[in-house]
Design a protein with these regions (language model features):
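A late C-terminal transmembrane helix in Major Facilitator Superfamily
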Residues: 212-244
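Helix-loop-helix hairpin linking two adjacent transmembrane segments in secondary transporters
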Residues: 25-68
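C-terminal membrane-cytosol helix-exit motif in multi-pass small-molecule transporters
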Residues: 58-76, 264-268
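Cytoplasmic helix-loop-helix junction between adjacent transmembrane helices
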Residues: 1-27
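Juxtamembrane intracellular "pre-TM" segments in multi-pass secondary transporters
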Residues: 72-98
Length: 280
């Protein structure tokens, strides 16, 4: 979905408003983080899990029909992933930096989200229900924060926004590893609010590093690899360190990596790259 979805938004919206438009787009995953567990818990009291999956599938089909009927998309066809296009993308340092940046961004949201309940229960002695509820409600603030992140990307530039988000989010992640009591709870609530501000700026910048026609391939290559890093390797690392009794230290290392990644943004394209045609 993402290659076509992001390309459709950036094609129909002026480049100076990409941050705000993509922030609206990012309301969807942030809302899902909050509502999906609550909806599943409520549905399981009425129907079995297979019925829930069927409803989800029918909803996806219905939305496809609605989009075909009333939706709009880009008025051009993207590139096919042939050797020429892939080589051109691989030759861009900015593409590799964006892959790393999205990996860091995803590790600060999905990666931590999947492992924090275990950390709170095993290292801080919280009840499982309390830990899950705390984590769910900590995502409420991220709904408004995504909009702020989009505004900041348009106002100060996506590169500056990403740098500040990584710096502050990394410090809060390190706080998760060392704080206890009220300080820990404050960090649990504040860190995701900052972390989600990355994505409007990240997608805005990712859409600028290649031509309009090859934008779909750039996104299709970058995001899966970033998910492998942030949603695969990082949770695996946290689990492995948790088994060794070093859960807190592992979270501190993730926070340190996030903070250091703020300096890597110096290699990303700056605000002068502001047209849909990108830099290649």
């Amino acid at each position: 979905y993402l290659p076509s979805g992001i390309a459709s938004i950036t094609d129909r919206v002026a480049a100076r408003h990409w941050g705000k438009a993509l922030a609206i787009h990012e309301l969807a995953p942030n809302t899902a983080f909050l509502l999906a567990p609550l909806m599943v818990e409520a549905a399981l009291g009425v129907v079995e899990w297979r019925t829930g999956l069927m409803v989800l599938g029918f909803a996806a089909l219905a939305l496809a029909g609605i989009f075909k009927w009333r939706g709009w998309g880009a008025d051009y066809c993207g590139e096919i992933p042939d050797r020429r296009v892939m080589a051109a993308i691989a030759a861009k340092p900015a593409a590799w930096l964006m892959m790393l940046s999205f990996g860091i961004g995803i590790s600060g949201t999905l990666g931590l989200y999947s492992m924090l309940p275990l950390f709170l229960v095993s290292d801080h002695g919280m009840e499982r229900q309390w830990a899950n509820s705390l984590l769910a409600f900590s995502r409420v603030g991220s709904l408004a924060a995504a909009g702020f992140g989009g505004w900041a990307a348009d106002r100060f530039g996506p590169r500056t926004t990403i740098r500040v988000v990584f710096l502050l989010s990394g410090l809060l992640i390190m706080g998760l590893g060392v704080l206890r009591g009220p300080g820990l709870i404050a960090a649990v609530f504040c860190q995701p609010v900052l972390a989600v501000c990355f994505f409007p700026a990240g997608f805005s910048l990712l859409s600028r590093i290649s031509s309009r026609r090859s934008q779909n391939i750039t996104i299709a290559v970058t995001i899966p690899m970033a998910f492998l890093i942030g949603g695969g390797i990082v949770p695996l690392f946290l689990g492995w360190m948790g088994d060794a009794g070093e859960f807190g230290r592992a979270i501190m290392l993730i926070g340190l990596a996030t903070t250091l990644a703020s300096s890597a943004t110096l290699g990303l394209p700056g605000p002068e790259v502001d047209t849909p045609e990108g830099i290649a």
